[in-house]
Amino acid sequence: MRGGTVLLILILLLGVIARSPMTALAAASILALSYLGWGGLLEWIEQNGVDTGLIMLTLAMLAPFATGKVGLREVLLSFASLPGIIAVIGGVLATNLNKRGIDLLSGEPQIIVGMIVGSLLGIVLFGGIPVGPLMAGGLTALILQIYGWLSK
C-alpha cells in the first residue's frame, strides 16, 4: 500500500471519528478515484479544485442577491454601520490570509496533514467548522511569520 493511500485512509478515519463528513467524504472520494484509476480526474482536481471550490463558495455568497433576499438597499445600509465597516475590514484581512495560505500550501504541501488534524481537533474540541485549508494555511503562515520575528 502506497504512503499516500495510508495517509488518505488515516484522514478518512479521523474525519469519521471527528464527525467531519466533509473531510471523510473528500478522503473517501479521492481514495475511490485513485482505486478506479481515474488519474486524469485526480490531476484535474489537484490543479483546479481550489479554484472550483472558491467559485462554488462565491456562488453561494452571491445567490441571495439573485433570489432577492439581499438587495442594494441592504448593501448600502451595511456600509453605513459599524458591523458593515468591520465586515469590509474582515474581508480584506481574510483574503490576505487566504493568499498566504495558498502560498504556504504551494511551497510546503506536506503541511496539509497538520492542518487537517488541527481542523479535526477544532471540530471535536471547540465545535468548529472546517471551511478548508486556505484559512488554516493563512493562519499557519501568519503564526510562522510571527514566530520568525520573535525567534530573531
Curated annotation (Swiss-Prot):
Species assigned in the record: Heliobacterium modesticaldum (strain ATCC 51547 / Ice1)
UniProt similarity note: Belongs to the UPF0756 family.
GO cellular component, one term: plasma membrane
Protein name: UPF0756 membrane protein Helmi_09930
Keyword Membrane found: yes
Its membrane topology: Multi-pass membrane protein
Protein location: Cell membrane
Keyword DNA-binding: no
Record's keyword terms, sorted: Cell membrane, Membrane, Transmembrane, Transmembrane helix
Segments traversing the membrane: 6-26, 52-72, 75-95, 111-131, 132-152
Highest classification ranks of the organism: Bacteria, Bacillati, Bacillota, Clostridia, Eubacteriales
